[in-house]
Amino acid sequence: MLERKPLFPNVIELNYQAGTVFGCNVYLIYDEGEWVLIDIGYEEVVDEVVDMIRNLDFPFSKCQALIATHADVDHIQGLALLKQAIKAPVAAHPLAATPLREADKLKTFAQIEAQGIDLPLPPVEVEKLIDDGDKIAIGGIELEVWLTPGHTDSQLSFRLGDLLFSGDNIYRDGCVGAIDAHHGSDLNAFISSLRRIRASDVKWLLPSHGPIFRKDEEMLDKTISRLENYRHMADFGTCATDWSLMDEWEREVAEGKLPT
């Protein structure tokens, strides 16, 4: 058996537990013998994760749910294989359920033709649909579900006391999850989600990538301000709400203004 290395009471992060980074952060939350897993990552890590869970003495029969923060391939490619091994229900937002069930490679980023990316994506059924305000019971504790769209339309976060399992919303360096229209990114929604996190009294953010960190309101303010600017930049294509240069150009054309 392995010695458990919880980061906080009732919380183990499996990269940290293993002492090596093998993919996205995988959180095991447990109490009174019951447990859930948040995200899994790629198929190649599933056997290692399953062995680790077994050697940490978490009975598979006590798993309440395999939770997907959202339906991006780097979080869920291994979900079907994990479900087969653990035999627990999958929980995700309704907007993630369809791309998971249909193995939608475009929506999940499993296929990006221009970059030569085409990853296998086995379909997986979602038995538990969860949404904002729902509670997930684990022994005597509960995860509170937050819908925090922006990176994707199905992005969920999960609150446990003063901890927030924050998905791809924000990382320790102030970066955010990829902004891309075809898989459901929305800058206005992203800003609202970040404001919700900032306004909350959570103390720790446990993201899906990179280190866990204390909530930093100054850093969040800078990130929110940056995304507010993104809304008015051509760089972000159809995710932008407007492009002020086009308004200026229209006025200059109407006025017959020459280049200076």
Predicted regions and their residues:
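Metallo-beta-lactamase
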Residues: 35, 42-44, 135, 142-222, ...
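Conserved beta-strand hairpin/beta-sheet module of binuclear metal-dependent hydrolase folds
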Residues: 2-56, 60, 157-167
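C-terminal regulatory/interaction regions
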Residues: 236-260
